[in-house]
Amino acid sequence: MRYLVLPVILLVLTGCKALTTFDKYATMRLYEVYEAENLSACDYKPQFRDCTVDKRSFNVRITDDKSKIALVVGKRYAYFGFTRDDFARQTQPLRDFLIWAEDPNAQDKQIKQLRKAGNVGGSLFYNTEVEYQFDYLHTRADVPLLVVKPHENANSYGLTVEEVKNLLSVMDAWYAGTFSGKQLT
């Protein structure tokens, strides 16, 4: 009887892996969701020129072919993200914000950028273009804030300097192939 314990455990584990693989393809899920530490943003409220108190924590969704990455809440809805084929251009507003934030006399600034919609509205696979809007501004408390609006009908998300640095750290690791977050799906 004791000789059957190990084979039974291995059989159960193999079955779990097969069930997970079956679920992935049966639901046509062509991505995986990973936990990423310290990725957050606030809901920006333009009428108050500030963020809400609550922070929204993000995980990342990465396509199976590693061509796209998006910030997601939990395992579901994609908020905004990046594509490998246009990574340098798409991350430039984030890098420029960090330079802008170092100048205490910097004036508010707005940048608009056409990008693939594949990271907006919950899907990674739409390839129509939408206009992302990046606002560099100071809050009422004079804190530099990057406000990202990934679509004209989307909410705006505010990121502090530290949050932008954390976001770039994760995005750069993904682009370099060294991202190692815990897999959630």
Residues covered by each model-derived region:
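Sec-dependent bacterial lipoprotein signal peptides
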Residues: M1-A18
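Positively charged, low-complexity terminal tracts
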Residues: C16-T185
